Amino acid sequence: MAEKRNIFLVGPMGAGKSTIGRQLAQQLNMEFFDSDQEIERRTGADVGWVFDVEGEDGFRDREEKVINELTEKQGIVLATGGGSVKSRETRNRLSARGVVVYLETTIEKQLARTQRDKKRPLLQVEAPPREVLEALARERNPLYEEIADVTIRTDEQSAKVVANQIINMLESS
């Protein structure tokens, strides 16, 4: 990878976007951003609180603005929120401003990785988590696929292995 292209990670919650993103940025000596963490930094509140107070629409508006600003940077790795792809504007910006890597995982892995995480507002509901994740997958997976330049399944692999796969795919493209 001679020039530093932006790398944008998309996929469902629990796919490993933040963990893999940090690993990838470290290996490539690039700056790492996480859109949820950036929203928390700017608001001084966690994403669950923003979700509760502003609702999903308010949160998505903030997310779209943050992703727009971050994708204007050069040479970054960005882990996006799982629902960021719901915005057509965000999908267009991600596609136009960098390489989009879809980190794919199974519902079982998502359940295992998110079961103790209280910072997942969409899982803090009455419905069983499996049903919530299945509904989100039906809605969002086609959107991830629509903009993905590369798709990698993360289920049984370490962040370092996935980061190396991404680097190898980018170098050969």
UniProtKB/Swiss-Prot annotation:
Catalytic activity: shikimate + ATP = 3-phosphoshikimate + ADP + H(+)
GO process annotations (BP): amino acid biosynthetic process; aromatic amino acid family biosynthetic process; chorismate biosynthetic process
Pfam families per record: SKI (PF01202)
Binding positions (Mg(2+)): 18
PROSITE patterns: SHIKIMATE_KINASE
Coiled-coil segments: none
Keywords: Amino-acid biosynthesis, Aromatic amino acid biosynthesis, ATP-binding, Cytoplasm, Kinase, Magnesium, Metal-binding, Nucleotide-binding, Transferase
Alphabetized InterPro entries for the sequence: P-loop_NTPase (IPR027417), Shikimate/glucono_kinase (IPR031322), Shikimate_kinase/TSH1 (IPR000623), Shikimate_kinase_CS (IPR023000)
Major localization class: cytoplasm
Pathway where it operates: Metabolic intermediate biosynthesis; chorismate biosynthesis; chorismate from D-erythrose 4-phosphate and phosphoenolpyruvate: step 5/7
Positions annotated to bind ATP: 14-19, 120, 157
GO CC terms: cytosol
Comment on bound cofactor: Binds 1 Mg(2+) ion per subunit.
Cellular localization per UniProt: Cytoplasm
Top-tier EC class: transferase
Function summary: Catalyzes the specific phosphorylation of the 3-hydroxyl group of shikimic acid using ATP as a cosubstrate.
Subunit structure: Monomer.
Protein name: Shikimate kinase 1
Organism expressing this protein natively: Sodalis glossinidius (strain morsitans)
Higher taxonomy: Bacteria, Pseudomonadati, Pseudomonadota, Gammaproteobacteria, Enterobacterales
